[in-house]
């Protein structure tokens, strides 16, 4: 159970709010804004804060996505849990089941089919 909680917390790093921490250093970093689904710049104070901070925009996008999370590849992550999840396959334009390992991975990872469909539904003009 403890490992599961740790993995779940690590997976949710992209959902954490921007947190510069209480210190007053000036360290420009990036965080994932879960409302806009974009990696954005912020100034980290140098201590405390949370794990939603990345040295480069590329690191942020690799971990959390950026802009179009539905275009990210399926990524089970390196851990070995067997958690049923859904991912959006842009090639087939469908949400598909996959087995999530419980840590890391990317933002194209949904708990339910409905959540996947809601996030990645096609924007049609008809």
Curated annotation (Swiss-Prot):
Alphabetized GO MF terms: serine-type endopeptidase inhibitor activity
Pfam families: Kunitz_BPTI
PROSITE patterns referenced in this protein's UniProt entry, alphabetically: BPTI_KUNITZ_1, BPTI_KUNITZ_2
Tissue and organ distribution: Component of the acid-soluble and acid-insoluble organic matrix of calcified shell layers (at protein level).
Keywords: Disulfide bond, Protease inhibitor, Repeat, Secreted, Serine protease inhibitor
Disulfide bonds: 14-64, 23-47, 39-60, 70-120, 79-103, 95-116
Annotated localization: Secreted
CDD domains recorded: Kunitz-type
Organism domain of life: Eukaryota
Residue ranges constituting the BPTI/Kunitz inhibitor domain according to the UniProt record: 14-64, 70-120
Keyword field contains Mitochondrion: no
Function in brief: Serine protease inhibitor.
Protein name: BPTI/Kunitz domain-containing protein
Organism of origin: Haliotis asinina
């Amino acid at each position: 159970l403890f490992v599961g909680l740790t993995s779940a917390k690590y997976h949710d790093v992209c959902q954490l709010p921007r947190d510069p921490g209480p210190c007053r250093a000036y360290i420009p970093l990036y965080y994932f804004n879960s409302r806009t689904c974009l990696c954005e710049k912020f100034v980290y104070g140098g201590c405390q804060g949370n794990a939603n901070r990345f040295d480069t925009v590329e690191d942020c996008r690799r971990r959390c996505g950026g802009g179009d999370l539905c275009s990210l590849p399926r990524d089970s992550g390196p851990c070995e849990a067997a958690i049923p999840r859904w991912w959006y396959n842009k090639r087939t334009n469908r949400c598909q089941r996959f087995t999530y390992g419980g840590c890391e991975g990317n933002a194209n990872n949904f708990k339910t089919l409905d959540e996947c469909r809601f996030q990645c539904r096609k924007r049609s003009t008809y």
